[in-house]
Amino acid sequence: NINSLKVHIVGGGISGLIAANILEKYGVKPIILEASDRVGGRLKTDIINGYQLDQGFQVLLSNYKAAQKYLDFDKLDLQKLKPGACIFVNGRPIKFGDPLRDPSLLLPTLFANLGTVRDKLKIAILNFKIQKKSIESIFKTPEVTTSKYLKNVGFSNRIIHNFFKPFFSGIFLETELKTSSRMFEFIFKMFGEGLALIPKNGIEEIPKQLKSYLMKTTFKFNSEVIKINNKKIILKNGEILKTNYTIVATEPNQMINNLKSPPFDWKSCQNLYFTTSKCIFENPFIGLIPNKESLINNIFYPSSIESNHKGKNELLSVTVVKEHEYSK
């Protein structure tokens, strides 16, 4: 009897919530075990001193097929970012973006001293080629590193340094662009076809919405799993849960003995928030810092988009991807 099955999902992030959604459709009543006090995983938002702070600068790309399948975009009250970036060269911001989706970016992009005219033409051609590829074909294409891929396409070192490196370092969370070219093509396609969006009430609105759809799922918060052994789940507080099936929707290496798959090499960044007297961008642009000596990779003003929680001053989000020796 499927209704009597005890199915536990370890992790209340996006993967865990989607797993519960699918199980409910088959009549299963899953139990989600979440180590923290709420759902969301890496998609969390805090309100501190009246400011709305996402835990990490994160955006939702409008053309993510899975997002379109499981989310109601209208209810998220999504705020649009400009389809481009402000790139700081010698301290001066230079606008660079997609004039096909925002005509106001045409002249700034044409005259942007970030690479050659040939580079800009190659970006347009690459965009056209990738839009014609299906996602399935992208992930079947022979892969190299993103860095090698860009050089193979024929981009100059200057455009790679000024645009591709800081932009994709902020996405891949690594500064050498060693990430697979398949992932580069996928992300490039998503940015080329859609827009970067942030929910008005913060990125945590995404998991909150997914949770609201779950009618048969039980949630156990502050329930950290330390070991999964056959039909038993052991929690950090010593509690032992009996289970028929367990879905691990989080880092599994510590809780499962003799895991056949190799340990995951997680990448990370540091996200800092500052208040400032003014926003230096007229519109919601991502700011890129292509300076090798700079600790900062990219910046964004959350106060440049609509929010239900705004403090007295402008809010600046700073992302650090580089490894460093600075302490807290």
Language-model segments: residues:
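Local beta-strand N-terminus motif with an aromatic residue
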Residues: 5, 57, 243-244
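N-terminal Rossmann-like FAD-binding beta1-loop-alpha1 element of flavoenzymes
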Residues: 5-32
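Short loop/edge segments at beta-strand edges and connector loops
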Residues: 11, 80-82, 221-223, 229
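Conserved Rossmann-like nucleotide-cofactor binding loop
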Residues: 15, 38, 253
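Glycine-rich FAD pyrophosphate-binding loop
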Residues: 24-48
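Mid-domain catalytic core of redox enzymes
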Residues: 26, 224-328
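Dinucleotide-binding Rossmann-like beta1-alpha1 core, especially the glycine-rich loop
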Residues: 49-137, 146
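Active-site/ligand-binding neighborhood in enzyme catalytic cores
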Residues: 108, 125-227
